[in-house]
A protein has these predicted regions:
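Short aromatic-enriched loop/helix-cap "lid" or pocket-rim segments at secondary-structure transitions
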Residues: 35-40, 90, 112-116, 122-123, ...
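Glycine-rich phosphate-binding loop used to anchor ATP phosphates in small-molecule kinases
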Residues: 59, 63-89
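PAPS-dependent sulfotransferase catalytic core
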Residues: 1-70, 221, 228, 297
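Short beta-strand segments
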Residues: 1-3, 76-79, 102-104, 181-183
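Conserved nucleotide-binding/hydrolysis micro-motifs of P-loop NTPases
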Residues: 29-30, 105-110, 187-188
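Conserved phosphate-donor/acceptor-positioning beta-strand/loop module used by diverse small-molecule
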Residues: 79, 90-117
């Protein structure tokens, strides 16, 4: 599972875990460990002096198996927002076609959700850290307000930009047929329908879910990791409770969203056609050696 923040991935995992065949946990370090292990071997002169690629492939590929060695379920869903940008990498190790569930949501709703969460989690004496957004602003001597928060979230160092970029890269590389986009508002409106589509995508039999008394059984240490105590909290009843973004976002951010909506929310196009309109008119890498694109024209 990949996708965008504040787009229902935790809710989706909570629902999928009702199915006795499925384990869907919190964000995992699996991809990062696999990638860094790969890079460490490639850059190690002892390895380049006497390479053993088959053994290295076995070592890297075994990370998934060992990380989930405590899980006895036939279907395991790993969560990392970078999976969309690493499809060929993971397919080289799992030896089968990747299938990535991609939760998405209107970008203005994502931004307003994050701002709302920050405001209801004001810093308390004794907390290990302030929220991760304001922490970045403080470290970079940037004034803290809703506009700078949104600007950071939509910058290359922000989680919204990073997840959008990773997803876009996967689409641009031609892997959209391996992605199932799940819109947050569709999930809340008709959850069973969305779950049935996920089961069809995964090749699993449908499963009848319940949508009351929900609880995230795989809670992360949100206050230590993000400085936000309810980052991955799930409401007991499935319903949309968010406020209209126009009541929360600064006017400048609303204008920015409205003028870039079709570029930002590119998945609405990719659902129906394989070739999509790029995020910018002509996707130009920020760095010729890296695969990242500007989000705004």
């Amino acid at each position: 599972m990949a996708g965008l923040p504040r787009s229902g991935s935790t809710l989706l995992s909570t629902l999928l875990n009702q199915n006795p065949r499925i384990y869907s946990g919190p964000s995992s370090p699996v991809l990062g460990v696999m990638y860094s292990t790969h890079d460490n071997f490639i850059s190690n002169e002892l390895y380049t002096g006497y390479p053993k690629p088959d053994q290295v492939n076995e070592i890297i590929g075994s990370v998934i198996e060992h990380w989930y060695s405590d899980i006895d379920k036939p279907v395991v869903i790993d969560k990392n927002r970078a999976w969309c940008a690493r499809v060929p990498f993971i397919e080289g190790y799992i030896k089968q076609e990747a299938k990535v569930i991609v939760p998405v949501r209107r970008i203005d709703e994502i931004l307003s959700s994050i701002l709302t969460m920050i405001k209801r989690n004001s810093f308390q004496e004794g907390q290990p850290r302030i929220n991760f957004v304001d922490e970045y602003l403080v470290k970079n001597n940037i004034p803290i307000n809703d506009e700078t928060r949104c600007q950071h979230l939509l910058s290359p160092d922000g989680i919204v930009w990073e997840s959008l970029n990773a997803t876009k890269l996967g689409v641009e590389e031609g892997h959209s047929d391996k992605f199932l986009f799940v819109d947050y508002n569709d999930l809340v409106k008709d959850p069973q329908k969305e779950l049935n589509e996920i089961y069809e995508f995964l090749g699993e039999e449908p499963f009848e879910h319940t949508f009351e008394n929900l609880s995230n059984e795989h809670r992360e240490d949100d206050i230590t990791t993000y400085g936000l105590s309810d980052m991955h909290e799930v409401h007991s009843e499935l319903k949309k409770v968010s406020t209209d973004p126009s009541e929360i976002l600064p006017d400048s951010m609303i204008e920015l969203y409205n003028s870039n909506k079709s570029n930002l929310e590119f998945w609405n196009v990719s659902k129906s056609v394989k070739t999509v309109t790029p995020i910018v008119t002509s996707p130009v890498p920020i760095d010729p050696s890296s695969k990242t694109y500007n989000l705004f024209s």
